[in-house]
Amino acid sequence: MKRSDYPSTKVSTSPRRLVAASPQQPVTALPGPDDVLRRTLPNGITVLARENWSAPSVVLEGYLLVGNLDEPEDLTGLASYTANMLSRGTRHRSFAEINEAIESVGASIGFGADRYTTSFSTKSLAEDLDLVLEILADELRAPAFPADHVEKVRGQRMTAIAERANDTRQMAGLALRELMYADHPLGRDLLGTEQSNAAIRRDALVEFYETFYRPQGMVVVVVGAIGAEEAAAKVAGVFGDWAGERPARPALPVVPGLDGVRERRVPMPDKSQADIILGWPAMPRLHPDFEKARLANTVLGVFGMMGRLGASVRERQGMAYYAYSRLAANKQSGLWLASAGVNPANIERAIRAMLEEVERLANERVPADELEDCKRYLTGSLPLQLETNDGVASILADIEWHGLGLDYVQRYCDIINGLTADDVLEVAQKYLAADKYALAVAGPMYGDLQIAL
């Protein structure tokens, strides 16, 4: 499960020696209550473990309840900055020593932060799990925040901010989020600005860590060539004595809706491509409409050549380099987005074509054959996600985060197959209002092209 808009910090190397897998048979059934161990430690850490003996590797994924919702408003980016520093040295190991230890066994450890959580992940051979867990626990429990690395990471973040300012897709995304959320905490920039990153000092990083990094609500998922009970015991061995509670996170205000069309254009005259994003407020992940909207979104901009948007705007009309839609839902709210990258001369035509497809979805029932194709896509893609330990760990972490229940994967196909064309029409009419949406465009505007010509 990816929660970070800022790249995780990872150290890895090429694969090392091959080790024979256990003679036990690989797990082929969908994960569920019968083969996923779930255990809560006395300090509030939840451990989920699933065995898979088809390869000698183990994947670990998890998160802590600290994110950019916990930042001071004037220090946006503090959560991801703190996450970037976790692998930069601890009270027991230097940055170089961590790298050498991890690289010597061909393993990887990564961190990232999003709005709600700070995530971590590891990958290693099963025989090296003890070492990886020891280093992971050291990084999470005893980071040193060495001053020289604080400045090195600051430089990397400043470079990322500069690169983002030169990227039409990212700038359109920033503008869209500002339109949708305004001053709401969910609209905060994960990476932060040049000003906020310049203002973040080492003592702010240390204070943020010491205030919010606590085991309460932490989740650790282990999947691979290790017994479930053994995996849980190993996690308890390195994290079980971690104590303390973080301050309660204040309740978020209600996300404001849209009362009309909001539009923002970000001129980037030196670019050859413009990026368009249309956005509508959507539902939280646990809302009864979510699965209906998932199917509707598959029709609109996922299935085949990116759904109807791709078929119309890209393939049939030839106006876009890409066109697709996405449904993003969190605990409090959601966004329904339609995006396209186009030749700047096609901006207005592409916007009209995208809106036409959205309106068609909200005004006409999806034909039975198209609906069945999209259902088969959704149900057929699930086994592909579960082919790897990474995929299983990601889904289990997502299930735990949203409280979907360990049987969710086993229920999923029935949920999707039970949806109808009326469900798709209903949810499209409810959320994809023709007169209430946000529009963000970044790139050369038509006037820029005229001047250039």
Task: Enumerate the language-model features and the residues they cover.
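A short, flexible N-terminal coil/short beta segment enriched in small residues
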Residues: 152-161, 165
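Conserved short beta-strand edge segments in small beta-sheet-based binding/regulatory domains
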Residues: 146-152, 248, 364-366
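His/Glu-rich zincin catalytic helix
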Residues: 1-101, 121-124, 134-136, 206-312, ...
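Short, polar/flexible loop-turn hinges at active-site or ligand-entry regions and domain interfaces
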Residues: 88-92, 140-148
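Short, low-order "capping/linker" segments at domain edges
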Residues: 163-165, 260-271, 380-385
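M16 family metallopeptidases and their MPP-like homologs
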Residues: 48-50, 55-84, 93-140, 158, ...
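Generic structural signal for individual residues within well-ordered alpha-helical segments
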Residues: 99, 130, 151, 198, ...
